[in-house]
Amino acid sequence: MLAWQVIGLLSCAACSSTSTEPAGGGDEFAVARARLVDGLRAQGITDPRVLNAMALVPREEFVRSEDRPQAYRDQALPIAGGQTISQPYIVALMTQVLELHGNERVLEVGTGSGLQAAVLSVLVREVYSIEIDPQLAAAAEHRLRALGYRNVRVRAGDGYYGWPEAAPFDAVIVTAAAAKIPQPLIAQLKPGGRLVMPLAKDDGQTLIRADKQEDGLRIVPVTAVAFVPMTGAVETPTP
């Protein structure tokens, strides 16, 4: 019940209506993509700009070739390096919770296959995406460029430290779970900015949104989730 209440609270009422007709005409993937978007709408994804982005991004290009027939099932799928591409509903939900309007600069931690970056690319001015696995980062950068997402920059590195030379950011999205929000990411978030990420506790993971205010962070829980753990410096205990 909490998830639906919070989704309603954080839905983007200010977003303008746009078409959700997917690119690609009548091919089978376009039909499946449109059906997926209808399902997302039924699950509480109400921001028309997010629905439009989900309708435009070809998820089949971001999964393994053997998984292309399952590309538009609402489920996570494996990718290289023991990682996963997130469930479409979670991609849409995290994007909606950020309340993006179009002129933002967004930092993504955990590029993976590049799907979330592609969705953000449709919605914002600039996307900076960091991936700790160099092979995944290189593959995602090549894939995004080949598909025409020109406002996305990808680099290999430890997302714990963010991308300081490109900061500050209007929004930060973290696609791996950690016990607490990395301090460098908070520092690189603009005042009034939003961060969304899964936080891990002993009893499971909770997707949260953190708003950076003058007196600190306002954290709102969204829903229970299951993400791969964040790796790198975040694993080192703080003295």
Range-by-range predicted roles:
Residues 1-13:
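Bacterial N-terminal signal peptides
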Residues 15-66:
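N-terminal auxiliary segments of SAM/dcSAM-dependent transferases
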Residues 16-24, 31-32, 169, 187, ...:
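SAM/dcSAM-binding transferase cores
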Residues 34-38, 42, 74, 85-104:
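Conserved alpha-helix/loop element of class I SAM-dependent methyltransferases that forms part
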Residues 60, 69, 78, 216, ...:
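Active-site/binding-pocket entry motifs
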Residues 62-80, 84-85:
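Short, surface-exposed glycine/acidic/tryptophan-bearing loops
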Residues 99-217:
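Conserved nucleotide-cofactor-binding alpha/beta core module
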